[in-house]
Amino acid sequence: MRLILLSSLLLLGIFLADGDEVDPDGKVLNSLIYGVMHLQREFANLKGAFLTVHRARSFGSGSERLYVTNKEIKNFEALRQICEQAEGHIPSPQLENQNKAFANVLERHGKEAYLVVGDSANFTNWAAGEPNKAAGTCVKADTHGSWHSASCDDNLLVVCEFYFIL
């Protein structure tokens, strides 16, 4: 939005710097003002539509985070790159409802996927006997949402996490 306003001011500055009789009737200025107001309304409409879709997508899971798969099967490093390119994150459920939303994706596809567990995690969902460093340094979730130690070379379902701070 700021970019639009700055662009409008730049255009006005170009007109003013021309040296000729500039906009004696105020038509250019009024046109710019109208254009900015129109863009502000469009932006508000798009923001509202986006929030509606986001709320609808997250309604069923009770989570404000979205877990989305591209259905590819990749190792941890490839997952990291894919999620980064998509401007998402490797899943890192911080609450039970987030883990459930993540597990729902895995259950629908009948596959396991990687996740990241932070050092200061208040929520964990380790399966019995886990974590087991002998199994690997990465973490995967099964179709029930239970966490297991895993090799980072395993090829698992690609799932990225997206969350919105508004």
Curated annotation (Swiss-Prot):
Expressed by the liver. Gene3D superfamilies: Mannose-Binding Protein A, subunit A. Residues 46-161 form the C-type lectin domain. Pfam families: Lectin_C. InterPro entries: C-type_lectin-like, C-type_lectin-like/link_sf, C-type_lectin_CS, CTDL_fold. One of its GO terms (cellular component) is extracellular region. Keywords: Calcium, Disulfide bond, Glycoprotein, Lectin, Phospholipase A2 inhibitor, Secreted, Signal. Disulfide bonds join C83-C160, C138-C152. It is found in: Secreted. Residues 1-19 form the signal peptide. GO terms for molecular function: carbohydrate binding; phospholipase A2 inhibitor activity. Glycans are attached at N122. SUPFAM superfamilies: C-type lectin-like. Homotrimer; non-covalently linked. Belongs to the alpha-type phospholipase A2 inhibitor family. This phospholipase A2 inhibitor binds directly phospholipase A2 in the presence or absence of calcium. This is Phospholipase A2 inhibitor clone 05.
